[in-house]
Amino acid sequence: MMNEITERETDYILQHIDSEGDYLYRLYRATNIHLLRGRMASGHLQGRLLKMLVHMIRPKNILEVGTFSGYSAISMAEGLEDGGCLFTYEINDELEPFTRPWIEGSEVADKIVFTIGDAIVEAPKLGITFDMVFLDGDKRTYLEAYEMALGIVRPGGFILADNTLWDGHVLEEARPADRQTLGIEHFNDFVANDPRVERVILPLRDGLTIIRKKG
């Protein structure tokens, strides 16, 4: 049985992994100061993991569903090889005045295409086969986003889904009005039984599911 990581252990981990760098440090701080639910940003540990996964998978094209403040997009773009591109969609247009300057001011701005819009509708129109997809948008539509992603990711490609433990709420029976938790539960149950993929859940922060499309 896994125990929760203590604050001291978290501090130890952060002292023994790569630095997030000054730019991402300032972005994370600004996110928590200026945006509601700032803790939704990936942060140091998850950001370094995402970058490492990009190094391992070596994708040419990445799709991100849910940009928020841009922290995860920048982290993943840092791991892209020359010629690689990350397409990130944010459905909440109120975030654009905060997020766009941070993305465009980063050293990897030339590798990121930031769009305000619904990725479920817009991403398939790109006509691109993706090597990796990161789902981190509206939990109520996770299953729809997953089906969209599965249709445009290559065989052998990867789909990552954030927040799949949802602060432990998935362990309890969700109220009918709690559509966010219900969305995560339906997603988790569906993916667990989907013969088209292999999957594993990491108990990192709020839960990170790594899915590989068979073929």
Cite the ranges covered by each PLM segment:
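A short alpha-helical cap/connector motif
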Residues: M1-M132, K139-L160, T164-G215
